[in-house]
Design a protein with these regions (language model features):
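Short, well-ordered strand-loop elements centered on a beta-strand within folded domains, enriched
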Residues: 10, 99-128, 152-155, 303-319, ...
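Conserved P-loop NTP-binding catalytic core
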Residues: 42-43, 56-114
């Protein structure tokens, strides 16, 4: 079954980096609006080191697992230092003309000598009746460390074993591989053929078990885009440009392509076609954001790729009037916009696209930043989650679309109390200064102590005590 819309509803974290516990709800889910008629924007604000980037990291981990890929080798470093496990639970809305329900995917990372592995996974489903969520029903649960039966409930275990003659052996092998590779068991390539045989429909929702698996996996591959701070860091190095791509109907399209800024790039012919289409799409918007600017592709002819496929050698140029310059010499802000514009266009036009961007404001002029967010909020269709330090968006978008980090690791994310009047920016600064919210928003720093610390640091540098 193909769903008309899939959207992220909420994210809840336990012991992820410096977040002991925190929950974020998308604006639509918070007011039980699942229509998908308009965009949802969620901005995350707070002081440095308060847990903003942790949300983006958790979404990246979820995307890796749902698409069957391994977690990064340093995954163990994302588990809080005082804990052995970190947990992330994401809720999604799956809707069609006939029905709509919420599916929760929860995964647990366990610290290990080689980093971390996925110790537990759980899929559950909740029906939506008159805007209210029914109690959660467990669809399947995996426990990597269980002895004997490691899938629950027992009815699902029996169903899976009955689907193939050698299912028990194949499941045991898949479990070992997933632990070693730090990948998902439920969404791995090894278990997909086994679970595809479990087509018994859920009695309450009338939905086949297999359909939910394939829907979440396809959504993570084609609809969920995560842009980390490493993305901006790569641009700042001026050696390459990470170009985030979205291409409808092609689950083989790479999420991100690294284009060299110091020499022409070589890409396979099929990927190059996508680059050409993307550049045409980018030019429709780029000339409005940066007047009189467009991109142009200069081809240098066919060239075989390192893996032996037919490819094209090309370079992307920045064009302003009659002047053409290599993209390397454009400003960091322009390169940042170019690198993520394709997926922002997709988010604007597709209700089932969710874009998560860390440090969205990096290198972008604050007035332009506010205008982009306002347009995406007012007339877009998809979802955007972003972190930022620039306070201009607080004046431009609806207050319900902003959450703030707190100094309490047990309750890391909150929305501001609406009392007190004034725009959100003024209320936020006032709350930092005099309090008045449910949680403290800022760990106080004394300006005199900061000045004294700078003086002491200078003496240390001079070798004086």
């Amino acid at each position: 079954m193909k769903y008309d819309i899939i959207r992220l509803m909420s994210a809840e974290l336990w012991n992820f980096k410096n977040v002991a516990h925190g929950k974020l709800e998308m604006p639509g889910a918070a007011c039980r609006d699942f229509s998908g008629d308009r965009s949802e924007i969620l901005g995350i604000y707070g002081q440095n080191g308060s847990g903003k980037t942790t949300v983006i990291d958790a979404l990246y981990f979820a995307k890796q697992l749902l698409t069957g890929h391994a977690l990064p080798s340093d995954a163990g470093d994302y588990i809080a230092k005082n804990a052995e496990e970190a947990v992330c639970a994401l809720s999604f809305y799956l809707g069609s003309q006939d029905t709509g329900f919420a599916v929760s995917y929860e995964f647990t990372l366990h610290r290990a000598s080689h980093g971390a592995y996925v110790a537990r996974e759980r899929l559950s489903r909740r029906m939506i009746l008159e805007g209210k969520l029914s109690p959660a029903k467990r669809l399947i649960e995996y426990d990597a460390n269980a002895e004997g039966r490691f899938l629950s409930p027992i009815s699902r275990w029996n169903e899976v074993l009955a689907s193939l003659p050698e299912a028990a052996v194949e499941l045991a092998v898949a479990r070992k591989l997933c632990i070693r590779n730090a990948s998902s068991f439920l969404f791995s390539a090894e278990t997909a053929p086994i679970f595809s045989g479990c087509c018994r429909k859920d009695a309450e929702s009338g939905e086949a078990f297999e359909n939910i698996f394939s829907a979440l996996s396809s959504y993570a591959a084609q609809g969920l885009f995560v842009i980390s701070s490493d993305h901006s860091g790569t641009i700042a190095l001026e050696a390459s440009l990470p170009l985030a791509l979205h291409f409808d109907g092609d689950d083989k399209t790479p999420d991100e392509m690294l284009l060299s800024l110091t020499e022409p790039s070589v890409q396979p012919s099929d990927t190059y076609k996508i680059v050409k289409i993307s550049v045409e799409s980018l030019n429709c918007v780029l000339g409005v954001l940066s007047p009189d600017m467009k991109l142009e592709i200069r081809e240098y002819g066919g060239q075989m790729t390192p893996d032996g496929r037919d490819g094209m050698r090309f370079e992307i140029l920045s064009v302003r009037g009659e002047n053409r310059i290599p993209l390397k010499y454009e400003s960091e802000g322009i390169k940042k916009l170019i690198s993520i514009l394709s997926i922002l266009i997709a988010m604007y036009n597709d209700a089932s696209v969710c874009v998560a961007v860390d440090e969205f404001d990096a290198g972008i002029y604050e007035y332009l930043l506010g205008e982009i967010l306002r347009i995406l909020e007012e007339s877009g269709r998809g979802q955007l989650i972003f972190t930022s330090h620039n306070l201009r968006p607080l004046e431009m978008i609806d207050p319900k679309n902003i959450v703030f980090t707190t100094t309490n690791p047990e309750n890391r994310y909150i929305r501001l109390d609406r009392s007190g009047g004034g725009n959100l920016r003024d209320r936020y600064i006032r709350s930092i200064s005099v309090g008045g919210q449910k949680e403290e928003l800022y760990g106080y720093t004394n300006p005199l102590e900061i000045a004294r610390a700078f003086r002491l640091a200078g003496r240390c540098g001079d070798g004086k005590s």
